[in-house]
Amino acid sequence: MTLDVGPEDELPDWAAAKEFYQKYDPKDIIGRGVSSVVRRCVHRATGDEFAVKIMEVSAERLSLEQLEEVRDATRREMHILRQVAGHPHIITLIDSYESSSFMFLVFDLMRKGELFDYLTEKVALSEKETRSIMRSLLEAVSFLHANNIVHRDLKPENILLDDNMQIRLSDFGFSCHLEAGEKLRELCGTPGYLAPEILKCSMDETHPGYGKEVDLWACGVILFTLLAGSPPFWHRRQILMLRMIMEGQYQFTSPEWDDRSNTVKDLISKLLQVDPEARLTAEQALQHPFFERCEGSQPWNLTPRQRFRVAVWTILAAGRVALSSHRLRPLTKNALLRDPYALRPVRRLIDNCAFRLYGHWVKKGEQQNRAALFQHQPPRLFPIAATELEGDSGAITEDEATLVRS
């Protein structure tokens, strides 16, 4: 998807990025970050397409302290990406260049874009599709943790899709190495995906800190969001949303959960454990029944004639199943008037019509607020204190601050 170009998106001149331009030809903009622009680029020698993340690190836009922070964070990201290179579900760093004013990171081109955009288009995903995505994500997280790396910013915007709808985990700007027994105290990430221990750590100087478990909490939030189309923790006042996170307050009450299995709800509940010690690890999550495949018995030794007969009966049975599934069930007027959204075919019709009419998702229940997906602040470091947290109408009151601390 090509994005509009603004004045701040102008390409670096040849002199400032000669080494990059000699090898790659930058094209249209396909994404933007807080301090970067992502463009499609073409390798001049081979014609292969890639994605290049361009970050301006000039004194004109950043202070000396900010410049050093950006450079250090980018170098740390590059080091981690090289360490985890080769994993099928982690983005591959192809090339990197650094000049006095710009830094360039060249990655694989993921043509399907962000999982966030895909979810916005689909509204909610099926359990089958969610199972495939979450298995790949947990495998990537397990690999990171095995290498003593914590990501700290897992969310649909940082999960990319290739042509085959396979995921790649990206944006390792907040990632860091974490040795056994070591704890972190830095507050970073996106509010809706922050684990309770991160918030508590920022409010209590005596808190021991947090570890790799924060990534599994974020996985639980992502799993919930993919199936419901809206996040588990949301309130129009951010201070109350943070309290919901710290207390683990979420519900399976929206209409989408009527069709979801108890197995996936159980997995979500074990990932969204407020106590990090009780939370599943990535390896344990992958062993959950939600990811189990039905293993058949030993293959039969059939003659060619027997195999042919089995194939014929299978085709006939599949045809009957397909035919019966397309037959409309009787629909009474009273049932339609009483609760049209409870009927799955009508529900999909309502969703599709609403999306085409308004161009965005439409709220259908009191517990739903898909707008929360679009209201998350960019990843950043932000202190949480009574004098600094804000709601939708200004600074929070002392009573609200007490709610969070309690």
Swiss-Prot record:
GO terms for molecular function: ATP binding; calmodulin binding; enzyme binding; phosphorylase kinase activity. Keywords: ATP-binding, Calmodulin-binding, Carbohydrate metabolism, Glycogen metabolism, Kinase, Nucleotide-binding, Serine/threonine-protein kinase, Transferase. It catalyses: 2 ATP + phosphorylase b = 2 ADP + phosphorylase a. ATP binds at residues 30-38, 53. Its EC number is 2.7.11.19. The active site is at 153 (proton acceptor). It comes from the Eukaryota. GO terms for cellular component: cytosol; phosphorylase kinase complex. Residues 306-330 are annotated as: Calmodulin-binding (domain-N). Residues 24-291 form the Protein kinase domain. Residues 346-370 are annotated as: Calmodulin-binding (domain-C). Belongs to the protein kinase superfamily. CAMK Ser/Thr protein kinase family. PANTHER family: SERINE/THREONINE-PROTEIN KINASE (PTHR24347). Catalytic subunit of the phosphorylase b kinase (PHK), which mediates the neural and hormonal regulation of glycogen breakdown (glycogenolysis) by phosphorylating and thereby activating glycogen phosphorylase. May regulate glycogeneolysis in the testis. In vitro, phosphorylates PYGM. Hexadecamer of 4 heterotetramers, each composed of alpha, beta, gamma, and delta subunits. Alpha (PHKA1 or PHKA2) and beta (PHKB) are regulatory subunits, gamma (PHKG1 or PHKG2) is the catalytic subunit, and delta is calmodulin. This is Phosphorylase b kinase gamma catalytic chain, liver/testis isoform. It comes from Mus musculus (Mouse). The gene is Phkg2.
